[in-house]
């Protein structure tokens, strides 16, 4: 892996770091102070999910770090956190393959400990220890230092997911999707090598790993996938494991590929559009923004749909 295009490579001074990632306040050097910049809660709208949302200023610094990390050339199988690639592109790679096997890594970001991130900055980007420490502080969060409104819900989530790392890759940071790959290159490369040797296409989109082939993906391959993931101390979410055969539509990172491999909008997305249309009268501004987001996602799959409604939502 070539890291030389990344301006964070071999950074040794705070002055240089401050200039590159636009740090305006020294409080962003210390994790104890950075922790106060997070709003931590459990989102229960769809399924329980740990949210660690950074403040506006912290998020701007994280975006600057992401900008530099995006200069690192990653393999074609990586789709999350990569400029110019999306969940839609990730799904299209598997178009035409009859068999699909999907896995989801359980609570992936919270399972990536601070140490992994620190070792990436110091060993791979060759920064000095103090710079590696600052960059790690900016991209991870220590929940023991955060002001959490509902601690009990967070503790319950941790118990249910059997999580151990209170200090981990921050779920709401713009840097997390690409860092989740960069700190786990050995695992993902091992999965990719297994796939390549068996004529299987593999892609990763954050915690979603998708395998597809024109031939049936054997039980032995699936067992090997599980062994590799377990070897690196991660877990596969059993309820989210999906196998699709040639006669069924395939759902990949939110995109449905029909029996012929063509992308089609999900029925749930259409239902959400109908719901937002009825909500327009009650909450016009909020509903209009949500409607625009939904229609943008649908039109990415089918550009011809909802043309007039899309124009209205953009006004």
Predicted regions: what they are:
Residues 1-133, 137-173, 181-193, 217-315:
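Right-hand nucleic-acid polymerase module
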Residues 102-106, 172, 176, 197-214:
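Catalytic palm active-site di-aspartate
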């Amino acid at each position: 892996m070539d890291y030389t295009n990344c301006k964070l490579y071999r950074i040794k001074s705070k002055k240089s770091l401050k200039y590159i990632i636009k740090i305006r306040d020294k409080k962003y050097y210390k994790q104890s102070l950075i922790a106060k910049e997070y709003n931590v809660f459990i989102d229960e709208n769809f399924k329980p999910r740990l949210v660690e949302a950074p403040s506006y200023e912290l998020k701007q610094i994280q975006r600057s770090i992401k900008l530099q990390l995006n200069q690192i050339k990653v393999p074609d199988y990586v789709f999350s956190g990569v400029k110019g690639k999306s969940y839609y592109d990730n799904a299209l790679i598997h178009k035409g393959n009859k068999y699909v096997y999907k896995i989801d890594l359980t609570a992936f970001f919270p399972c990536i400990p601070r140490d992994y991130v620190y070792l990436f900055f110091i060993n791979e980007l060759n920064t000095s220890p103090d710079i590696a420490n600052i960059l790690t502080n900016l991209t991870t969060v220590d929940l023991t230092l955060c002001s959490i409104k509902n601690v009990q819900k967070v503790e319950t989530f941790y118990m249910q997911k059997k999580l151990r790392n209170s200090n981990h890759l921050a779920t709401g940071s713009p840097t997390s999707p690409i860092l989740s790959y960069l700190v786990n290159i050995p695992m993902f490369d091992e999965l990719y090598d297994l796939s390549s040797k068996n004529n299987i296409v593999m892609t990763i989109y954050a915690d979603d790993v998708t395998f597809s082939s024109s031939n049936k993906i054997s039980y032995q391959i699936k067992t090997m996938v599980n062994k590799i993931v377990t070897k690196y101390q991660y877990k596969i979410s059993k309820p989210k494991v999906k196998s699709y055969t040639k006669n069924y539509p395939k759902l990949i990172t939110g995109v449905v590929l029909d029996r012929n491999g063509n992308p089609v909008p999900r029925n749930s997305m259409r239902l959400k559009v109908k719901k937002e249309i009825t909500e327009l009268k009650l909450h016009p501004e909020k509903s209009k923004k949500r409607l625009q987001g939904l229609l943008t996602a649908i039109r990415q799959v089918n550009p011809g749909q909802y043309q007039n409604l899309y124009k209205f939502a953009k006004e």
